[in-house]
C-alpha cells in the first residue's frame, strides 16, 4: 500500500489516503493541489530517499510525501 501525505508549514502532515497503484496516488495528489493551492501552473519535481518520495510543486514550505506503508514493507521482507 502507498500512503500519500500533504506536508505544510514544513512539518505538519495531512493524510490524503492509501492507494494500491502509484498512478491513483498521483491523480489524488494532482487533484488536491488543483483544489487547495493558489499556484496555477505547478512544476512538479520529485526526490527519492529510501522508501519515501518527496514531490515539490513550487510552494516554499509545502510538499507531498509518498511512502510505502509498514504492512507492505513486512510483506516484502518475508
List PLM regions with ranges:
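Short aromatic-glycine-(Arg/Gly/Cys) micro-motifs in beta-strand/loop hairpins
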Residues: 1-15
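N-terminal processing/targeting junctions
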Residues: 12, 25-26
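Conserved aromatic
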Residues: 16-22
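Short, mixed-charge low-complexity intrinsically disordered segments
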Residues: 34-78
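Residue-level detector of alpha-helical secondary structure
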Residues: 26, 30-33
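A short local loop/turn or secondary-structure capping micro-motif enriched for an aromatic residue
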Residues: 23-25, 63
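Local beta-strand/beta-hairpin segments that build beta-sheet-rich folds
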Residues: 15-16, 61
Amino acid at each position: 500500500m502507498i500512503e500519500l501525505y500533504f506536508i505544510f508549514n514544513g512539518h505538519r502532515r495531512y493524510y490524503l489516503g492509501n492507494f494500491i497503484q502509484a498512478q491513483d496516488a498521483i491523480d489524488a495528489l494532482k487533484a488536491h493541489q488543483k483544489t487547495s493551492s493558489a499556484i496555477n501552473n505547478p512544476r512538479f519535481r520529485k526526490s527519492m530517499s529510501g522508501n519515501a518520495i518527496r514531490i515539490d510543486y513550487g510552494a516554499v514550505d509545502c510538499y507531498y510525501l509518498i511512502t510505502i506503508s509498514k504492512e507492505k514493507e513486512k510483506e516484502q521482507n518475508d
